[in-house]
Amino acid sequence: MGAQGFFLAVEGIDGSGKSGIVRSLAAHLGAEGRDVLVTREPGGTPEGEAIRGLVLAGADEAWDPMAELLLMTAARVQHVRRVIAPALAQGQVVISDRYAGSTLAYQGTGRGLSEAFIRTLHAEATGDLWPDLTLVLDLEAGIGLARSRRRLTGETLDEGRFESLDLAFHERIRAAFLAQAARDPGRHAVIDASGTPEEVQARACAALTPFLAQAPV
């Protein structure tokens, strides 16, 4: 359990609807009277948002995988120490749109870096802070990629570096998230992300409720 609060991460492939579910869950929990903080990775702090702009834009070959990992970790240090840990200490429910599960999936499985090294680096950088619960929004990779590319077409900010990669890459990422959930079922729930936003929200709320019932928030 994350200090006095509750730490929830929402993970999934690009186009799985994470941001919408984060907003819906925050509204739902807020209506229940809970003190909710919504954040995202990479980002969450001015320094993290600057790193986000560096890492998510440009050509895929712009960053060496190790450099990419270290940038993501640098952003997370700021995020945990300045935002997440203080909020948990104050008893808030923290909902993060991506966290370390994405690092294991994208920089580990996707880029071929050592999972053991990523976990060691994470432990040193964050005090080994992991979410109390990670919701994995699961969707066929082809559907998610098509959704994500449609969304990016209408945006001015270029955050489409990972969306430019082929379907096989995104299928590996999906498999990586599912493998994480299978290895640690006590801290993960896989949510079917197909269907309407309302249907997905209902599934997410149903998975979250028993965990929050045991939380001191």
Curated annotation (Swiss-Prot):
Catalytic activity annotation: dTMP + ATP = dTDP + ADP
User: Which Pfam families does the record associate with it?
Assistant: Thymidylate_kin
Q: Name one GO molecular function term.
A: dTMP kinase activity
Q: InterPro entries this protein is in?
A: P-loop_NTPase, Thymidylate_kin-like_dom, Thymidylate_kin_CS, Thymidylate_kinase
Which residues participate in ATP binding? G12, I13, D14, G15, S16, G17, K18, S19
**According to its UniProt entry, what is the function of this protein?**
Phosphorylation of dTMP to form dTDP in both de novo and salvage pathways of dTTP synthesis.
Task: Identify its protein family.
Answer: Belongs to the thymidylate kinase family.
From the Swiss-Prot or TrEMBL record, give the protein name: Thymidylate kinase
- Can you name the source organism? Cereibacter sphaeroides (strain KD131 / KCTC 12085) (Rhodobacter sphaeroides)
Q: State the gene name recorded for this protein.
A: tmk
